[in-house]
Amino acid sequence: MKVDKLKSALSNYPTGIVCVFSKTKGFYNAIIVNSFTSVSLNPPIVSWCLDKKSSKFKVFKNCKNQTIVILSNKQKKFANHIAFHRDKVSDLEFNKILKMSICDLYCAIFKKIKIGDHFTFFLKIKKISGIKKIKPLVYYKKKFLTI
Protein backbone atom coordinates (compact mmCIF):
# COMPACT_ATOMS: atom_id res chain seq x y z
CA MET A 1 0.00 0.00 0.00
CA LYS A 2 1.24 3.48 -0.82
CA VAL A 3 2.08 5.59 2.22
CA ASP A 4 0.56 8.77 0.72
CA LYS A 5 -2.77 7.02 0.15
CA LEU A 6 -2.79 5.72 3.73
CA LYS A 7 -1.93 9.16 5.13
CA SER A 8 -4.70 10.73 3.03
CA ALA A 9 -7.26 8.22 4.28
CA LEU A 10 -6.23 8.60 7.93
CA SER A 11 -6.24 12.42 7.73
CA ASN A 12 -10.05 12.21 7.60
CA TYR A 13 -10.08 11.17 11.26
CA PRO A 14 -9.71 14.11 13.67
CA THR A 15 -7.37 13.54 16.60
CA GLY A 16 -6.35 15.45 19.69
CA ILE A 17 -2.90 16.98 19.88
CA VAL A 18 -0.35 16.59 22.65
CA CYS A 19 3.20 17.74 23.07
CA VAL A 20 5.55 15.17 24.55
CA PHE A 21 8.49 16.52 26.55
CA SER A 22 11.64 14.89 27.88
CA LYS A 23 14.24 16.88 29.80
CA THR A 24 17.93 16.44 28.95
CA LYS A 25 20.92 18.72 29.43
CA GLY A 26 18.87 21.56 30.91
CA PHE A 27 16.31 21.79 28.10
CA TYR A 28 13.00 20.13 27.34
CA ASN A 29 13.00 18.18 24.09
CA ALA A 30 9.58 18.51 22.50
CA ILE A 31 7.58 16.73 19.82
CA ILE A 32 3.99 17.25 18.64
CA VAL A 33 2.01 14.00 18.59
CA ASN A 34 -1.45 13.00 17.36
CA SER A 35 -1.06 9.26 18.07
CA PHE A 36 -1.69 9.69 21.81
CA THR A 37 -4.25 7.37 23.42
CA SER A 38 -5.36 5.98 26.74
CA VAL A 39 -4.48 2.29 27.15
CA SER A 40 -5.42 1.35 30.72
CA LEU A 41 -7.07 2.99 33.72
CA ASN A 42 -5.64 0.58 36.30
CA PRO A 43 -2.71 0.89 36.14
CA PRO A 44 -2.95 4.29 34.40
CA ILE A 45 -1.17 3.73 31.07
CA VAL A 46 -1.14 5.93 27.95
CA SER A 47 0.72 5.49 24.68
CA TRP A 48 2.05 7.35 21.67
CA CYS A 49 4.03 6.39 18.55
CA LEU A 50 7.21 7.78 16.97
CA ASP A 51 8.70 7.10 13.55
CA LYS A 52 12.16 5.52 13.86
CA LYS A 53 13.39 7.98 11.19
CA SER A 54 12.42 11.01 13.27
CA SER A 55 15.28 13.35 14.22
CA LYS A 56 13.90 13.18 17.77
CA PHE A 57 13.82 9.38 17.94
CA LYS A 58 17.08 8.84 19.85
CA VAL A 59 16.25 11.39 22.57
CA PHE A 60 12.83 9.92 23.31
CA LYS A 61 13.89 6.29 22.94
CA ASN A 62 16.57 6.72 25.62
CA CYS A 63 14.69 8.80 28.21
CA LYS A 64 13.14 7.41 31.40
CA ASN A 65 10.45 10.04 32.00
CA GLN A 66 8.16 12.03 29.75
CA THR A 67 5.57 14.74 30.26
CA ILE A 68 2.48 14.65 28.07
CA VAL A 69 0.87 18.07 27.66
CA ILE A 70 -2.66 18.03 26.24
CA LEU A 71 -2.77 21.17 24.13
CA SER A 72 -5.60 23.70 24.20
CA ASN A 73 -7.10 25.64 21.32
CA LYS A 74 -4.95 28.59 22.45
CA GLN A 75 -1.73 26.73 21.57
CA LYS A 76 -2.00 26.42 17.78
CA LYS A 77 0.96 28.77 17.18
CA PHE A 78 3.09 26.84 19.67
CA ALA A 79 2.17 23.49 18.05
CA ASN A 80 3.15 24.76 14.59
CA HIS A 81 6.39 26.18 15.97
CA ILE A 82 7.43 22.88 17.58
CA ALA A 83 6.20 20.76 14.66
CA PHE A 84 8.05 22.71 11.98
CA HIS A 85 10.78 24.89 13.48
CA ARG A 86 12.07 23.89 16.87
CA ASP A 87 12.48 20.91 19.17
CA LYS A 88 13.72 22.34 22.49
CA VAL A 89 12.28 24.72 25.06
CA SER A 90 13.68 26.28 28.24
CA ASP A 91 12.26 25.88 31.76
CA LEU A 92 10.58 29.28 31.45
CA GLU A 93 8.94 28.41 28.12
CA PHE A 94 7.89 25.00 29.47
CA ASN A 95 6.10 26.61 32.42
CA LYS A 96 4.28 29.05 30.09
CA ILE A 97 3.15 26.11 27.95
CA LEU A 98 1.79 24.31 31.02
CA LYS A 99 -0.27 27.37 32.01
CA MET A 100 -2.10 27.36 28.66
CA SER A 101 -2.58 23.59 28.34
CA ILE A 102 -5.66 21.53 29.23
CA CYS A 103 -3.67 19.27 31.54
CA ASP A 104 -0.27 17.68 32.04
CA LEU A 105 0.56 14.03 32.62
CA TYR A 106 3.88 13.26 34.30
CA CYS A 107 4.89 9.76 33.24
CA ALA A 108 7.55 7.08 33.48
CA ILE A 109 8.38 4.77 30.60
CA PHE A 110 6.51 1.52 31.18
CA LYS A 111 7.36 -0.30 27.95
CA LYS A 112 8.65 0.38 24.42
CA ILE A 113 7.69 -1.79 21.47
CA LYS A 114 9.03 -1.67 17.93
CA ILE A 115 6.17 -2.07 15.44
CA GLY A 116 6.93 -1.67 11.74
CA ASP A 117 8.62 1.67 11.11
CA HIS A 118 7.58 3.09 14.51
CA PHE A 119 8.17 2.63 18.22
CA THR A 120 5.19 2.68 20.55
CA PHE A 121 5.87 4.15 23.98
CA PHE A 122 3.70 2.97 26.85
CA LEU A 123 3.85 5.39 29.77
CA LYS A 124 2.67 4.95 33.34
CA ILE A 125 1.07 8.15 34.64
CA LYS A 126 2.61 9.20 37.95
CA LYS A 127 0.86 12.56 38.37
CA ILE A 128 -1.84 14.64 36.66
CA SER A 129 -1.71 18.41 36.95
CA GLY A 130 -3.67 21.48 35.87
CA ILE A 131 -6.97 20.11 34.56
CA LYS A 132 -8.71 23.11 32.97
CA LYS A 133 -12.10 23.45 31.27
CA ILE A 134 -10.89 24.79 27.92
CA LYS A 135 -11.28 23.50 24.39
CA PRO A 136 -8.66 21.22 22.79
CA LEU A 137 -6.45 21.65 19.76
CA VAL A 138 -7.21 19.03 17.10
CA TYR A 139 -5.53 17.72 13.96
CA TYR A 140 -7.67 17.15 10.85
CA LYS A 141 -6.81 17.01 7.14
CA LYS A 142 -3.14 17.80 7.89
CA LYS A 143 -3.98 21.00 9.80
CA PHE A 144 -4.19 22.11 13.42
CA LEU A 145 -7.74 23.29 14.10
CA THR A 146 -9.70 24.60 17.03
CA ILE A 147 -13.19 23.57 18.05
Q: What is the predicted function of each stretch?
A:
Residues 1-147:
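Basic, polyanion-binding surface patches
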